[in-house]
Amino acid sequence: GGGTATCCGMSDTSTGSGPAFLATDGIHNFRDYGGYPTQGGGRVRSGLLFRSGQHVEASEADLQTFADLGIRTVIDLRGNAERERHPCRRPDLWDGDVVFYDGETSSRPPHEPDRPMELTAQSAHERMLKVYTRMPHNEAMQTIFGQYLRALAEREGASLVHCFAGKDRTGIAAALLHHILGVSRADMLAEFLRTNDAPTYDILERQSLPGIEARLGGPLDRAAVAELMEVREAYF
């Protein structure tokens, strides 16, 4: 079995439906996705499974939180271009492993439009539905999801899985693991939707919105932004 990790740095922003989000300065949506009951009376272990957005703006305090959690393996679901544009920070003395796909997992992060278009809440919602519909058929995503599951099965200690925002690709990765472990669909959905309660929405907007608006030529409708930055039950 894997080693244990100390759950420290927790914020006071628990929704009551799962472990609290970790308090961070520059990492969006950082949380433990363990703790859920499984069929047969078991429970997914807490303190071993973490998820988040990218760590490109991680502060020194964030890196200390990362180190204190005992994370030995990072599974980065982003493709090469994303990782080169937004290199993640790690603690100076961290000697863990980063698992990644050597290629592109997405032509652009799922919440960023590929080309100039008039984005309304409806068109943004429809775009995100297509992202989730295509994901199971994306060979790169199939490969990295397999790498993720193998890493959890074979490696000791705590792990962290992340993409750009920690909500779409990461949300499906967490759901795949929960499904395998026998977590109920209701709890899987609740975990997926907890992204919308993350107290770090400003970090995601800061990292995503300027680039999106630059490509589209102006400010976006707030309802459209919400469809891109949040998750919906329909996406699951």
Residue ranges and their predicted role:
Residues G1-T4:
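Compositionally biased, low-complexity flexible segments
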Residues C7-L160, I172-F236:
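Cys-dependent protein tyrosine phosphatase-like superfamily
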Residues A165, R169-T170:
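Ser/Thr-glycine-rich phosphate-binding loops at phosphate-binding pockets of nucleotides
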